[in-house]
């Protein structure tokens, strides 16, 4: 899965990005091992004390917008930052939270490829929280099923 932030300016560093995350009140800590300008591939993060990672890459905004002609972009953008993740729900939640903070800090917009439309940073934060919560619900459901199974197998 993937999402993008389109903006007309870039943050100077991962540290500045972390400040934007903190300002938004999001429970996300980003690795600062790779300079922002060199981000390409897996970016280790911790969401609510849980380590995970998502891919983060700089993209050509003009090329991206040309490829996605079905999306109603409100105007041309200068920069694009890609966020990609697989089946790890916390990676997805982290990517949405990081994208939201980045968009807020750069006055950018978020392209949600799942919905094939632009979404607000506030909506990205909602999606992040929904994903993180769904993981907890899944674990609770599995725990209950295991408990029922164990109780039925005992004499």
Predicted regions and their residues:
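Acidic (Asp/Glu-rich) sequence patches and key acidic residues
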Residues: 1-155
């Amino acid at each position: 899965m993937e999402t993008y932030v389109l903006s007309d300016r870039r943050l100077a560093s991962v540290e500045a990005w972390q400040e934007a995350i903190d300002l938004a009140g999001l429970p996300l800590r980003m690795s600062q091992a790779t300079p922002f300008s060199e981000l390409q591939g897996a970016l280790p993060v911790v969401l609510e004390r849980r380590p995970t990672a998502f891919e983060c890459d700089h993209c050509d905004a003009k090329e991206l917008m040309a490829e996605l002609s079905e999306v109603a972009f409100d105007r041309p953008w200068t920069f694009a930052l890609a966020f990609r993740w697989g089946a790890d729900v916390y990676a997805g939640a982290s990517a949405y939270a990081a994208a939201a903070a980045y968009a807020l800090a750069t006055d950018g917009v978020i392209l949600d490829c799942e919905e094939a439309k632009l979404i607000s940073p506030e909506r990205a934060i909602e999606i992040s929280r929904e994903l993180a919560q769904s993981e907890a619900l899944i674990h609770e459901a599995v725990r209950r099923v295991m408990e029922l199974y164990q109780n039925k197998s005992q004499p």
